């Protein structure tokens, strides 16, 4: 299978042996608007991206808590146009989202705040340039309509492999994660 591992930040991408979402798709930083989505670069770079998108089987995205709604919708739109099965959600590419939504939130600048606001209208249609109800990935049109299967991992591995870390420390981390003291 042709698998691409992506992350929101460069450091996380290095840690998982992948690339940033922006680098792989050629997105500019900032708000992703449908009216501005296009493959950028030289003609050769653009064709290389098209070939890469058409050959994809799966994408794994780490740090899902930082993945904004506009960015996930942009990934879906590009793959629907240039993926292996145009017109299908994510162009027929299997998408795996990983991470803890209680970790770091999506980053929204002051200039981008107006794009993320509560909406009372029909949420079953893409809204794009009209905004999203929140910056969280799960409020993207692509996620709400993508049929994602949610799994909750409950066993902690990282702290259990370190003999110096006790159960009290692991419980303390869990309380912090949930905003309890």
PLM feature spans:
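Conserved ATP-binding/catalytic motifs of P-loop helicase motor domains
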Residues: 1-181
């Amino acid at each position: 299978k042709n698998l691409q591992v992506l992350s929101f930040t460069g450091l996380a991408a290095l840690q998982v042996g992948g690339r940033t979402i922006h680098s792989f798709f050629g997105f500019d930083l900032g708000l992703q608007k449908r009216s501005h989505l296009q493959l950028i670069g030289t003609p050769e770079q653009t064709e290389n991206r098209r070939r890469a998108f058409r050959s994809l089987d799966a994408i794994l995205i780490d740090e899902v808590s930082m993945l904004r709604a506009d960015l996930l919708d942009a990934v879906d739109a590009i793959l629907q146009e240039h993926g292996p099965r145009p017109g299908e959600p994510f162009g027929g590419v299997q998408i795996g989202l990983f991470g803890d939504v209680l970790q770091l939130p999506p980053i929204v600048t002051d200039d981008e705040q107006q794009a993320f606001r509560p909406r009372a209208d029909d949420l079953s249609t893409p809204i794009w340039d009209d905004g999203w109800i929140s910056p969280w990935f799960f409020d993207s049109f692509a996620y709400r309509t993508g049929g994602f299967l949610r799994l909750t991992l409950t066993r902690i591995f990282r702290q259990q492999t370190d003999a110096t870390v006790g159960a009290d420390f692991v419980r303390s981390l869990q309380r912090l994660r949930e905003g309890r003291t």
